[in-house]
Amino acid sequence: MSLLDYFKTKKEPSTAVTAKERLQIIVAHQRGERGAPDYFPQMKQEIIEVIRKYVQVGPDQVSVQLEQTDDNFSVLELNVTLPEQS
């Protein structure tokens, strides 16, 4: 029986599974922003604008996140996907 299973085509994940995964990502993102200070969205936008002055990047290539730990520390994480140089 396992030999027949090997040759069967694998099913693509259903749209319900894909939608559930996307919803989980959105909920996790919103939970992460729940403890962020009020000025965080404006600060995030200003950081992205400064990066765009020097490097041509799209809004989806810059990620800014604020993580707060139990030890009363805040970590500002900034990830930028830089374009390849020609």
UniProtKB/Swiss-Prot annotation:
<keyword id="KW-0132">Cell division</keyword>
<dbReference type="GO" id="GO:0032955">
    <property type="term" value="P:regulation of division septum assembly"/>
</dbReference>
<dbReference type="InterPro" id="IPR005527">
    <property type="entry name" value="MinE"/>
</dbReference>
<keyword id="KW-0131">Cell cycle</keyword>
<comment type="function">
    <text>Prevents the cell division inhibition by proteins MinC and MinD at internal division sites while permitting inhibition at polar sites. This ensures cell division at the proper site by restricting the formation of a division septum at the midpoint of the long axis of the cell.</text>
</comment>
<comment type="similarity">
    <text>Belongs to the MinE family.</text>
</comment>
<dbReference type="InterPro" id="IPR036707">
    <property type="entry name" value="MinE_sf"/>
</dbReference>
<dbReference type="Pfam" id="PF03776">
    <property type="entry name" value="MinE"/>
</dbReference>
<dbReference type="GO" id="GO:0051301">
    <property type="term" value="P:cell division"/>
</dbReference>
<protein>
    <recommendedName>
        <fullName>Cell division topological specificity factor</fullName>
    </recommendedName>
</protein>
